[in-house]
Amino acid sequence: MAKQIFINLAVTDLQRSMDFYTALGFTNNPQFSDDMGKCMVWSEHIFVMLLTHEKFANFATKPIADTKSSVAGLFSLALDSVDEVNSMVNNGLKAGGTEPSEMKDYGFMQQRT
């Protein structure tokens, strides 16, 4: 079996979250989706599971973090060029995302949050 990673995120608006990830270039896998969770595919081995709070709570043993006041995690996506990074971030901003800090250039990589 191929190694895969499933990043599970608790979301308050499932459709809006799905639309956001679609704008970033993810696709939906309906086989692993229902009205309480959507499987969004980044690559053959990387998936983001968007789960309602109710469904997420079935898997979690602690309360769901309030991400308006706390950071629940940091996840990075590697792209081939700065232009691809800028395009993805701009698509995310158009889809309702926010960019709390400016791009940082480390020479060997760029970071946009």
Residue ranges and their predicted role:
Residues R16, V82-S87:
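Short, conserved charged micro-motifs
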Residues A2, S43-H45, K68-A72:
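Short connector loops at helix/strand junctions that flank enzyme active sites
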Residues N86-T113:
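Vicinal oxygen chelate
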Residues F59-A65:
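Short beta-strand/turn micro-motifs at beta-sheet edges
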Residues N8-A57:
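Core segments of cupin and vicinal oxygen chelate
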Residues D35-G37, A72, Q110-R112:
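Short hydrophobic/aromatic beta-strand or adjacent loop that forms the aromatic wall/cage
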Residues M1-M18, A72-L77:
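N-terminal beta-strand motif that seeds the catalytic metal site of vicinal oxygen chelate
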